[in-house]
Each structure stands twice: as C-alpha cells, then as structure tokens.
C-alpha cells in the first residue's frame, strides 16, 4: 500500500471533440458486486457517505491501537495522501488485535498538509465502498473523526508493481515474463470491470504504483481518489479538469479535458510498455531522446524485427519471441494517438489471456544473476539507480 505520488500541477484545458468509448456488455461484471447500474456521484461531505457501503466505520482509537499508535516502524509507505501503516484486526469482529494475530491491514492516514484532500478521500470511500471484484483492492473501512481521515485496506504483501519493476534491492527480484503477463491480465480485468455497463467508472490514474500485488502476485487496482463516473445517455465523454500523472495520461485528455474509457486504455498501454521494457514512463536520467518511454519505444514497436530492442534485459531472454511480439503489438494499439484506434479493455483481456502460460508463474531468481551482465544489452543502458523520478500529478 505504499503508493507514492509526486507534486501536483494545475492544468486547465479548452474543450474540443473526443472519441467515444466503446460499448457492450462486460462479462467481468458478473462475478462482482455493485450497488446499482452506476456508482452514485462522489459525496461532498462525510454526511453523504452512503450507508449502503459495505465497509466499517472505525473509531480513531481503534486504528491507533491496531497500528500500535502509528509507530514509525509500522510505516509501509508514504505519498501525497499521507502515510500508510501496517496494523492488525480480528478477521470477524474487525476489532484491533495484537501484532501478528488476526488479519493484517494497511491504514492510510490523510496528511492535512498534503496535496491530496478530503474530496479524494470521499471518492475512495464512495467507489471502493460499493465495488467488489477480485482485481480491486478491498476497502475494509474508514475513519472520520474530528480532523482525522483514514482508510483501511486489505494488506497486499507483495507491494506495488512499481517497486518490483524499478526498485533495485534483494527484496525485489526481477519479475519473470510469465509473471508480468499474469499481472497485466489481472490489472486489465480490473479495468474491464470498471468500464462495464454495470459499473461505468473511468479510473483516470492507472499506473504501476496503483497496481498492488497479493501473496500470489495477483494484481489489484488501488487508489480511486481520481476515479470518475463515465458518460451516460448519448454522451460520448465526460468533461473534467485534467488530473492524473504525467507520462500516463492520454494525449486527447491532456488537450481537451474530455475523458473516456479509452483514456484508461492508453494508460494501460503505457504500463504494459513499462512491464515489457523495464523502463519508467518518464525518466530524465535516461539519455536525450529516451526520457519519454512512449515516444522512444513507438518506432521499435512498429517493426517486428526491432521489438526485441525494447525488451527488458532482466528477462534474460526467458520468453517466447512470438508472445513478446504479440504483447508489444497490443501495447502499440493501446497507445494509439487516436482514441478510436485503441481496443477496449475486454479486447485487451482477450489478447492477454492468449499470452498466459499454464505453468506456475513466479519470480525467477536466475534472472537476477543474469541481469548484471545483460543490463547493457538489447534495451540500452543499465536502468538508472539514481532514485525514483517524481511522477507529477496533473490537477
């Protein structure tokens, strides 16, 4: 749950035309629960939090006990929202328990000085409090008491996809090809569910730090603070202030403020490209001309003979070239400049299902040994270890 956000940047955009999202009934809505045909608008105050939300309203003292008084050594991560703490509660009663007993939780505590505010906290409660799906992180509860605003989630022991792709440490081994495709499929199913006719939600901030992994490396989407209800009736898009993260936001959304499900598809394409290449969406530590992953990779993606040049050297060649070409082609389609040329998420899921390996997937320890000699291989210089470049939020 240690999602990290960078500095927010104001951006207002003029309105022009935007491509309409694809329709159709989604099979991914069938194994999930949602309160109505569409999620109600984000409440403006805690008094408007829907009583139907299937989450617990915690007292602040309960969460203080569960996290051992928010001790520094229980911090899982920090971000624009605030800090995330590890805690323990009883699985049935949800009452705080002793460390190491009961259910592990992640408690996100709003920083009153932070740039992510109360409205995003409300949006998170509103969406995750009503939506239930295998590929969405579970919101256990929330706390609103005086000035305190907290969110309580299921604990995701493998952390974020971002850490596994970009953090260099013995704790994070290079992800195998099969495991990357498994994670991509899970995340795609989560987005397909959100875009379904039953839900009609645009995620708006799909990126590696918002894809969390459970013990089995199953992907779950987190952080719904920027989520938006999709267009209704005969409307083709939602007009909104430009928000999200540089490097992941679709070009037409940046230019017009028009938001569609195809905006999420573009963001997914960027993340898939990060998974294929082992490079960040934006990295100013790279050589000139390679700062923007999409711009750098697009020419290689357009040629099957050159696709191998973008593939992560840490994969150690342990993949089928035919499957790599298919995944690269899918990424290219998702990052199409024209939204109408992008597939919908159900189509993305269908392609990714073809790329799954029936064998057990997992991190390959041997890849870590090979990476030291191959990091300067097919996809260029060794990934930067100068620290994480800040992903700037668009607000």
Swiss-Prot record:
Keywords: ATP-binding, Immunity, Innate immunity, Kinase, Nucleotide-binding, Plant defense, Serine/threonine-protein kinase, Transferase. Interacts with CERK1. Belongs to the protein kinase superfamily. Ser/Thr protein kinase family. Its EC number is 2.7.11.1. Gene3D superfamilies: Phosphorylase Kinase, domain 1, Transferase(Phosphotransferase) domain 1. One of its GO terms (molecular function) is protein serine kinase activity. This is Receptor-like cytoplasmic kinase 176. It comes from Oryza sativa subsp. japonica (Rice). GO terms for biological process: innate immune response. It catalyses: L-seryl-[protein] + ATP = O-phospho-L-seryl-[protein] + ADP + H(+); L-threonyl-[protein] + ATP = O-phospho-L-threonyl-[protein] + ADP + H(+). Residues 70-355 form the Protein kinase domain. It is an enzyme of class 2 (transferase). Residues 1-45, 359-395 are annotated as: Disordered. It holds the Pfam family PK_Tyr_Ser-Thr. ATP binds at residues 76-84, 108.
């Amino acid at each position: 749950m240690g999602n990290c956000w960078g500095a927010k940047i104001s951006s207002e955009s003029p309105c022009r035309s935007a491509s309409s999202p694809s329709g159709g009934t989604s099979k991914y809505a069938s194994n999930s629960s949602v309160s109505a045909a569409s999620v109600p608008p984000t409440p403006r105050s805690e008094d408007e939090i829907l009583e139907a939300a299937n989450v617990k309203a915690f007292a602040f003292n309960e969460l203080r006990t569960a996290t051992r008084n928010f001790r520094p050594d229980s911090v899982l991560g920090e971000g624009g929202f605030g800090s995330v703490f590890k805690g323990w509660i009883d699985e049935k009663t949800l009452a705080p328990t002793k460390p190491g007993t009961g259910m592990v939780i992640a408690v996100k505590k709003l920083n009153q000085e932070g740039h992510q505010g109360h409205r995003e906290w409300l949006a998170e409660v509103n969406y995750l409090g009503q939506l239930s799906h295998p590929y969405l992180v579970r919101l256990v509860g929330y706390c609103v008491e005086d000035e305190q605003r907290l969110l309580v989630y299921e604990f995701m022991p493998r952390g974020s996809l971002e850490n596994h792709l970009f953090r260099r440490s013995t704790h994070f081994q290079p992800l195998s090809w099969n495991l990357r495709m498994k994670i991509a499929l899970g995340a795609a199913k989560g987005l397909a569910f959100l875009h379904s006719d039953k839900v009609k939600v645009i995620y708006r901030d799909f990126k590696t730090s918002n894809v969390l992994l459970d013990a089995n490396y199953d992907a779950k989407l987190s952080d719904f603070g920027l989520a938006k209800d999709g267009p209704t009736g005969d409307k083709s898009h939602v007009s909104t202030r430009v928000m999200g993260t540089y490097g992941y936001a679709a070009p037409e959304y940046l230019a017009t403020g028009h938001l569609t499900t195809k905006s999420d598809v573009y963001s997914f394409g960027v993340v898939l490209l990060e998974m294929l290449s082992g490079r960040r969406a934006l990295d100013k530590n790279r050589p000139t001309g390679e700062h923007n992953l999409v711009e750098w990779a697009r020419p290689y993606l357009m040629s099957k003979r050159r696709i191998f040049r973008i593939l992560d050297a840490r994969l150690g060649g342990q993949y089928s070239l035919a499957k790599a070409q298919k995944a690269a082609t899918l990424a290219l389609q998702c990052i199409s400049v024209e939204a109408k040329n992008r597939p919908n998420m159900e189509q993305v899921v269908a392609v990714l299902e073809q790329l799954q390996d029936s064998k057990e997937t997992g991190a390959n320890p041997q890849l870590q040994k090979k990476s030291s000699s191959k990091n300067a291989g097919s996809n260029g210089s060794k990934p930067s270890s100068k620290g994480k470049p800040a992903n700037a939020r668009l607000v």
